[in-house]
Amino acid sequence: MSPLPPSAEACRNELLNRLAREAYRHGDFTLASGRQSNHYVNCKPVSLSGSGLALLGLALLKYVEPDAVCVAGLTLGADPLVSAVAMAAAQAERTLNALIVRKQAKGHGTAAWLEGPLPPSGARITVLEDVVTTGGSSLKAVQQLRETGYLVTRVVTIVDRQEGGEEALNAAELELVSLYQLNQVAERARQLETET
């Protein structure tokens, strides 16, 4: 007999611990947005590990719109996320494909901006992001998806740095849903540090 699956709260707590230990750093950093910060979050050590990917797939899937047929995101941060969510959906017997949005059109072949099984025009797509600061990466992905004819109204991120990203996304008629806010990850990192 296999053990019972962990509760959603246990998964959420484990994911927060993993992000605090493996993704969060305190120091002096220049962010992708060009801003300076004392906090840095690189989710890839978690999103590129098998166990982290499993946790993220389940956690993010919960916030994908029920009528979405795809999840998509800008390469590179969203690549493992869209794959994990599509797999978690399949395991839950839900059809949900993954798309990767290129930062620029492919320079050969089809010159495509999007990679993956393309849904019909007008389909709803939920955008996934690892970290939202200003919202620039998400907005670039959304722009390409909307220009291709897809309906995008929600962005789901692992961490919202709370530095204007939500406001920028709201201005583009997008709802931002975050698993965690930066202060939650930073606080958990401090707690874990004092425990050792």
UniProtKB/Swiss-Prot annotation:
Keywords: Glycosyltransferase, Magnesium, Pyrimidine biosynthesis, Transferase. Orotate binds at T133, R161. Its EC number is 2.4.2.10. Belongs to the purine/pyrimidine phosphoribosyltransferase family. PyrE subfamily. NCBIfam families: pyrE. Homodimer. This is Orotate phosphoribosyltransferase. It comes from Prochlorococcus marinus (strain MIT 9313).
